[in-house]
Amino acid sequence: VIDGKPIFLKEHFQRMSESINLSGIEGNINYEEFKNSVELLIKENSFKNLNIRVSYFYDKKPLTLFYFIESYYPSKDEFAEGVHTVTVKMERANPNVKSFQKEYKDKVTRIIKENNAFEAILINHDNTVSEGSKSNIFFVEGNKLITSPDSSVLLGVTRSKVISVCEENSIEVHKRIIRLDEIESF
């Protein structure tokens, strides 16, 4: 939500629907109900610039929860200078499904805090980079953008938008396996 307006609502709905389908959870979610719930949450609260988490559960019948969560976006200085990251050997069970995994979240949060890091870069068992624990990873190589293959990451809205902007501006995007020992070369 930016300035009280939901952004990329249809895309977020589509990504959530795909996660529900890929996870094998029963039931489904209706776009109009999704949209109306988001709009009602915004209308009934005074928050203008926060993220919304939508959690979907199914136990005999579907339950969808919509609630604001704290968000943090890098400052101009952090964008210019970069942020401290840490690598962590950890894989999500199905990277294409956005789901809550308490053990994963607790471990990543602890590692980020212990290392005073902004983000954790997830490293697979074969020493390849997948994505950030809560962000997309893109590397610049000359005039190209390098990112992990679709099979290794959450195919989220932000990633899709970044790739679209690159394509619209004739910036090459290469989706390929990125080895841990390559990171420093970017």
Question: What does each model-found stretch correspond to?
Answer:
Residues 41-46:
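Phosphate/pyrophosphate-binding loops at sites that engage ATP/ADP/AMP, CoA/4′-phosphopantetheine
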Residues 47-54:
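Ordered, amphipathic secondary-structure segments that act as subunit-interaction surfaces
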